[in-house]
Amino acid sequence: MKEQKLIHEGLITESLPNGMFRVRLDNEKMILGYVSGRIRRSFIRILPGDRVKIEVSRYDSTRGRIIYRLRNKDSND
């Protein structure tokens, strides 16, 4: 049976080496996020200040996988 993941939204606060990021979730928890393979393959740039969707395991709530970068309202693209 596949493990159920919790999906949260958050804000990238800091960029760390090797595709890791510090993410502040909407419930004010800080977790460590890493980029999913699909985002890595698509060359999607994630920078501090971006809003993202992050998938968190219910067994380890301190780490999560960034699965989607949300569009900024003030960008032109």
Curated annotation (Swiss-Prot):
InterPro entries: NA-bd_OB-fold (IPR012340), RNA-binding_domain_S1_IF1 (IPR006196), S1_domain (IPR003029), TIF_IF1 (IPR004368). GO terms for molecular function: ribosome binding; rRNA binding; translation initiation factor activity. Residues 1-71 form the S1-like domain. Disulfide bonds: none annotated. PROSITE patterns: S1_IF1_TYPE. SUPFAM superfamilies: Nucleic acid-binding proteins. It comes from the Eukaryota. Keywords: Chloroplast, Initiation factor, Plastid, Protein biosynthesis, RNA-binding, rRNA-binding. It is found in: Plastid, Chloroplast. One of its GO terms (cellular component) is cytosol. PANTHER family: TRANSLATION INITIATION FACTOR IF-1, CHLOROPLASTIC. Belongs to the IF-1 family. Component of the 30S ribosomal translation pre-initiation complex which assembles on the 30S ribosome in the order IF-2 and IF-3, IF-1 and N-formylmethionyl-tRNA(fMet); mRNA recruitment can occur at any time during PIC assembly. One of the essential components for the initiation of protein synthesis. Stabilizes the binding of IF-2 and IF-3 on the 30S subunit to which N-formylmethionyl-tRNA(fMet) subsequently binds. Helps modulate mRNA selection, yielding the 30S pre-initiation complex (PIC). Upon addition of the 50S ribosomal subunit IF-1, IF-2 and IF-3 are released leaving the mature 70S translation initiation complex. This is Translation initiation factor IF-1, chloroplastic. It comes from Ceratophyllum demersum (Rigid hornwort).
